[in-house]
A protein has these predicted regions:
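Cofactor-/ligand-binding subdomain signature composed of acidic, glycine-rich
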Residues: 1-40, 149, 153-162, 168, ...
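Phosphate-moiety recognition in structured ligand-binding domains
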Residues: 2-17, 136, 254, 258-261, ...
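Conserved active-site and cofactor/substrate-binding residues in soluble primary-metabolism enzymes
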Residues: 9, 55, 154, 158, ...
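Short N-terminal or domain-adjacent regulatory/targeting segments
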Residues: 10-39, 171-195, 236-241, 246
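Anionic-ligand anchoring segments at beta-strand to alpha-helix junctions in alpha/beta enzyme folds, i.e.
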Residues: 31-88, 196-247
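Glycine-rich phosphate-binding loops that contact phosphosugars or nucleotide phosphates
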Residues: 38-183, 252-288
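Short, hydrophobic/amphipathic alpha-helical patches that form generic packing surfaces
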Residues: 59, 158-169, 220-223, 301-317
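Internal, active-site/partner-interface "lid" segment
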Residues: 147, 163-198, 325-355
Length: 355
């Protein structure tokens, strides 16, 4: 087994501080941020993160609050017409505001819709492009005493906590969360349960409050060098997307199972997941089920913590990996592609999309 690199803290050690992080959120004032988020719900909210991050949670929370929320990567934001940007509110989320993704997105949003664009950040200095490009009264800068390594762990939980508090208006919520993280690993109906180290592919299914978690787990799995992963909502999986999973379970044509289904469930998905197990998953499909009894947007945070616990358990205990400092056998510098692939230059050559 490959030994985890110890140049950075183990991912599981950072996750263990989740309660402390969320108690910090409870003491943080989010009043101004809440007022901006919930002002003029008739306008869609476009949520943009740094490259590599999906901003599904604020989009979901905005939808629950009565508006229409849309998540967009910086490249997807480039495909939105100026008219669409003008008619929307734009929320840019960036811890430091220092990479070219948020620099591009903040410049474009501020040029088209300066009053309707806001920034969420943890860094208050001259290197943060949000302070250079946006109106100061629309920048919401929060303290973040929690650093991370290669992947976002504590700052991800901090961000989700601040978003939940701002949208829900609830100042106390950690008492509703379970910090004894858990998941269940079992065989669907019959057969031998494989060791997790034999699994090369994961199929993650979600609904409602689980969607933001699905994107975060995909990112953690792939960026952590752990396994390939397909994410899909429960209904779309029934439209033929079960074929790959079934073709990778042991049979007279397949020597060894190397796939596992991950089911994210709340009370809303429990019956759907049970039915799907019977109708769309092989009898000998190994399953990881991550469930919460919470039936509110707080369920996203519980599912996130339990899901990260599974991912880090898989990596550290079964594969000998530290997702917070992944092995990189290709030799490609982990940070180089962010700056060397010049997407902004290419976009400017062709201008706005057209019919």
């Amino acid at each position: 087994m490959i030994k985890p690199k110890q140049d950075k803290p183990l991912a599981s050690a950072l996750l263990a501080q989740a309660k402390e992080v969320l108690e910090f959120v409870e003491r943080t004032d989010v009043t101004d941020f809440r007022n901006w988020l919930l002002g003029d719900l008739s306008k869609p909210l476009v949520c943009i993160g740094n490259g590599g991050k999906h901003t599904t949670y604020p989009a979901l929370l905005y939808g629950i609050s009565g508006g229409v929320g849309k998540t967009a990567t910086p490249l997807e934001f480039a495909s939105m017409s100026p008219e669409a940007v003008k008619r929307s509110k734009v929320l840019l989320l960036s811890s430091s505001g220092k990479n070219m993704d948020v620099t591009y997105a903040s410049k474009r949003a501020a040029e088209i819709n300066p009053e309707g664009t806001a920034g969420f950040t943890f860094t208050d200095n001259e290197r943060n492009c949000l302070f250079k490009n946006l109106n100061r009264h629309n920048i919401f800068c929060f303290k973040n005493p929690y650093s991370d390594g290669f992947i976002s762990i504590r700052s991800k939980i901090l961000t989700c906590g601040l978003l939940y508090k701002a949208f829900s208006g609830k100042n106390s919520f950690t008492d509703k969360l379970n910090f004894d993280f858990k998941y269940d690993y079992f065989i669907n109906k019959s057969g031998e349960l494989p060791d997790l180290k034999r699994i090369k592919h994961f199929v993650l299914l979600y609904g409602s409050y689980g969607e933001p978690v699905a994107h975060d787990i995909e990112s953690a799995m792939v960026e952590g060098g752990i396994a390939s992963i397909q994410i899909c909502d429960y209904r779309n999986f029934c439209h033929g997307r079960f074929i790959f999973a079934g073709n990778h379970c042991q049979s007279n044509k397949v020597p060894e199972t190397d796939v596992c289904a991950i089911l994210l469930t709340t009370p809303r998905e429990a019956k759907i997941a049970e039915s799907l197990r019977k109708e769309a998953l092989a009898d000998n499909m190994p399953i990881v089920q991550i469930h919460t009894d919470l039936d509110s947007s707080l369920a996203t945070i519980q599912l996130l913590m339990d899901s990260l616990h599974f991912v880090f358990d898989l990596a550290e205990k079964h594969l000998g990996l530290n997702p917070n400092s992944p092995h990189n056998f290709s030799g490609i510098d982990k940070r180089k592609p962010m700056n060397s692939v010049r997407f902004v230059t290419a976009l400017k050559e062709h201008g706005e999309l057209s019919h």
